[in-house]
């Protein structure tokens, strides 16, 4: 605090502040939620945390819901001890116990065990792999000079009018880019979790594709950490 704002804060003041804030945080964490959400995004960000005198990197998962009227709401923050179906089942049950009866679409990157947990807790919910993460994961293994062209080509997949057209474009692009030693296997292997995207119209796709709200939440969280 002194380095950032020029204000010296004593340990007693920190204790007094946290004693006041922690009950409010716990109340917020337990608050009732909407009965139904159109989309819930689950994404991770990482913080350096001091644990037993050692600085370790911890994952914090953010669940952000989009209501049936299009409003965005943070459902909760969850510290990730381990990714597993059991871990995600406990989180989804916690969300369910806070009043959420139905989620139409759950959108996330390939978090281990999440899809299985969704099937157990919300069996009618559709799981959708995050398109933005798919794009980023593909581009990170490509040379800088090829990234712009590949990013443009990938639009032929996720902007296709139908699932069939998107898949056909994917196969054609795989053939094209394999000659440059660029693999699109990640898209092919995950197609089952990508194809729900094509069931929806442009406006819904735009919401599913965009991660600005989640990214903004990550940014603000890291600003607080700093």
Locate the predicted segments by residue:
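Alpha-helix N-cap recognition
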Residues: 84, 162-166, 224
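Conserved small/polar residues in nucleotide/adenosyl-binding loops
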Residues: 217-226
